[in-house]
Amino acid sequence: MSKQILILPGDGIGPEIMAEAVKVLELANEKYSLGFELSHDVIGGAAIDKHGVPLADETLDRARAADAVLLGAVGGPKWDTIERDIRPERGLLKIRAQLGLFGNLRPAILYPQLADASSLKPEIAAGLDILIVRELTGGIYFGAPRGTRTLENGERQSYDTLPYSESEIRRIARVGFDMARVRGKKLCSVDKANVLASSQLWREVVEQVAKDYPDVELSHMYVDNAAMQLVRAPKQFDVIVTDNMFGDILSDEASMLTGSIGMLPSASLDANNKGMYEPCHGSAPDIAGKGIANPLATILSVSMMLRYSFNLHEAADAIEKAVSVVLDQGLRTGDIFSTGCTKVGTQEMGDAVVAALRNL
């Protein structure tokens, strides 16, 4: 029986980078006889333009029925002035919540070919390989109550809520420990337990879960210190587990240690490893339509999809190898370009990966 993959290109550069990722996926599908069937739909601003909402019910139903979802990016200035509850980003939050995608895996890997593109000195960044495990469906992005009220003195006051239950913390902690167990057996839990009640519970529950993983070394770090340590000595980290907002911020910070956020894929998984896969970067409306966006993060998201949702490690390894081959050839989009390399556009980069994959 075939596996169903739902393609959601989204907004901005989303359609451009997705086109290249789909070419790679289609070749892998043929080369390794994967039995995938691909279908396409809209999300974010594109869905607002078509349906009036950032995620139509029928699209959500198709996502539920699919075996995996491949997403481009959402958002753009065109929709910045509309009501917050129907902005493009709400479609992304909704699909994550409705599919139960609570575990977000964000790798930060510095390819040796891109050592000069890192914001850090080579001796600090060389060999960097961090995995950030971010809780994705709880915390301050979903907490209630939230809103804006007018005080007695006439001044407006806005407020948000950062709730976490024991079960929410426990399940994401287990993802972190499981990932650490198959990597370097080191897990750093990042919180703000010196200030936040939610972080105090977070730390307590993570300590409880740690008893089931005696082979994994657990450490704790406050988020402000973690942000500093990522720049000072990033290779001290192997796997980081943290909450929604902290993970959002730290993973973007970690991305620049690798040279470009355009290189970084991500996976969002449910309890059964059904997932949605997307690049870490946004929709980059400033370069949309110019054919210069880096498609490698989206292509590497395909590799993560094959690995984590389907256990197709041979095909996943081949895609990652093809990307490495292209980098060895000196091909670079503008965001990772350096002297002595050849600057290429979105389609050229995608074609090069396809050619490399075909020749493996």
Curated annotation (Swiss-Prot):
The chain's disulfide connectivity reads: none
Q: What does the entry list as the binding residues for substrate?
A: 96, 106, 134, 224
Q: Name one Pfam family in it.
A: Iso_dh
- Which cellular compartments is it found in? Cytoplasm
Enumerate the InterPro entries for this protein.
Answer: IsoCit/isopropylmalate_DH_CS (IPR019818), IsoPropMal-DH-like_dom (IPR024084), Isopropylmalate_DH (IPR004429)
EC number in record: 1.1.1.85
Q: Which Gene3D superfamilies match?
A: Isopropylmalate Dehydrogenase
Q: Name one GO cellular component term.
A: cytosol
Which keywords are on file for this protein? Amino-acid biosynthesis, Branched-chain amino acid biosynthesis, Cytoplasm, Leucine biosynthesis, Magnesium, Manganese, Metal-binding, NAD, Oxidoreductase
Say yes or no: keyword Ribonucleoprotein present: no
Q: Could you give a single Gene Ontology term from the biological process aspect?
A: L-leucine biosynthetic process
Query: Where are the annotated coiled coils located?
Result: none
SUPFAM superfamilies xref list: Isocitrate/Isopropylmalate dehydrogenase-like
Query: Annotated pathway, please?
Result: Amino-acid biosynthesis; L-leucine biosynthesis; L-leucine from 3-methyl-2-oxobutanoate: step 3/4
The answer, when asked if Manganese is one of the entry's keywords, is yes
Residue intervals passing through the bilayer: none
Family recorded in the similarity comment: Belongs to the isocitrate and isopropylmalate dehydrogenases family. LeuB type 1 subfamily.
Which HAMAP family does the entry mention? LeuB_type1
The protein's assembly and partners = Homodimer.
- Explain the purpose of this protein: Catalyzes the oxidation of 3-carboxy-2-hydroxy-4-methylpentanoate (3-isopropylmalate) to 3-carboxy-4-methyl-2-oxopentanoate. The product decarboxylates to 4-methyl-2 oxopentanoate.
Protein name, as recorded:
3-isopropylmalate dehydrogenase
Organism of this sequence = Pseudomonas fluorescens (strain Pf0-1)
Q: Which gene encodes it?
A: leuB
